[in-house]
């Protein structure tokens, strides 16, 4: 998701994503926020796409900011601790992998749609957590 402070624009890249497409999406982005991204997302992108996101934008892993505030666990655990609810509470990381597999092996459009909806919700929740930890306008105080 890309937030300009006024709103959140969600861009989803999948299935044969090219480094150029991600580079275009990140063009002009100053800061990138992830949850456990320093351990998963960024190394995955660096390995698969040969793209160093941290060289393009300042990266903040909200997992560590959560830890400093006594919020431990995965993204869903932090959401629960903050009282956030999900529209898709039955979908978790394992189910996301299963949905991707169904899409890739059976060309299951419904599985892909559900996965993309789950990912959109992840991004929106992450933005909410970022705002709770950082505030709406200011620079992060990590």
Residue ranges of each PLM-predicted region?
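Conserved DEDDh/DEDDy metal-dependent 3′-5′ exonuclease domain
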Residues: 2-85
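Acidic, Mg2+-coordinating catalytic module of metal-dependent nucleases/exonucleases
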Residues: 79-142
């Amino acid at each position: 998701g890309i937030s300009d402070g006024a709103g959140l624009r969600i861009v989803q890249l999948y299935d044969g994503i090219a480094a150029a497409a991600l580079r275009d999406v990140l063009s002009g982005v100053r800061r990138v926020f992830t949850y456990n991204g320093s351990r998963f997302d960024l190394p995955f992108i660096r390995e698969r796409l040969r793209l160093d996101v941290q060289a393009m934008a300042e990266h903040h892993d909200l997992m560590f900011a959560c830890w400093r505030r006594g919020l431990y666990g995965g993204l869903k655990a932090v959401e629960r601790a903050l009282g956030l609810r999900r529209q898709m509470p039955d979908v978790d990381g394992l189910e996301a992998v299963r949905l991707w597999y169904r899409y890739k092996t059976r060309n299951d459009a419904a599985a892909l749609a559900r996965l993309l909806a789950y990912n959109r919700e992840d991004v929106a929740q992450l933005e909410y957590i970022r705002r709770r930890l950082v505030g709406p306008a200011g620079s992060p105080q990590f």
